[in-house]
Amino acid sequence: VAQIVNGKSLKPRSGGAPKQIVLLLHGFGSSGADMIALAPEWQDTLPDALFLAPHAPQRCGIIGDGYQWWGLSGRSPSALAAGAASAAPAIDAFIDRKLNQYRLSESNLALVGFSQGTMMALHVGLRRPRAVAAVVGYSGILTDCTTLAHTDFAKPPVLLIHGTADPVVPVSALHRAESELKRLGVEVTTHVSHCLGHSVDPAGLRLGRDFITHELLRSTPGIR
């Protein structure tokens, strides 16, 4: 299993020990440095959260100095599902390590992804032994979930956000993911940003913040 050993992080604004972890998973050819930029916008409502934005284990040979969770050799549903499955063990091991380090559980963890990172957040979030508090996916795809249909799998609340003008991952991916998740019994909320390309806008940033704040505080009563 490839090991995640580096990346960017932002400690709790409160100065105390983390009471929640927000794991930020970047897109293809990007890095944790891009994703950690979301964290300052969310610290006001989650002052006790540790924000972690690891670099994917593989270097991306296509885009500059970026990283990839897996190489995008194909975009067929089977290729994407296989890629996500191959990358998941490194993320699961990283999560296990951090939860153990800070003596927290899945109920204290939110997963946030962008593009390929959304594929990973959804793949991992739906397959953890216990449900995480929340999954937020920006501009991504839900990889094949047929193997989950007849299993008693974790069903964390999911928020999907996408731009109508996304030239990389069409917004139709959001609608397909919403339909599939609902069919599987997952609580899913969606937001479409009109005229937005393959990026995150201020409205999406606010919605993501409010969603993970609500779910993290709901799943860890007594923390305010």
Regions found by a protein language model. Name each.
Residues K19-Q20, E106-S107, F153-V158, L184-E187:
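Short, proline-enriched alpha-helix->beta-strand connector loops that line the catalytic pocket
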Residues H175-R224:
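C-terminal catalytic histidine-bearing segment of alpha/beta-hydrolase fold enzymes
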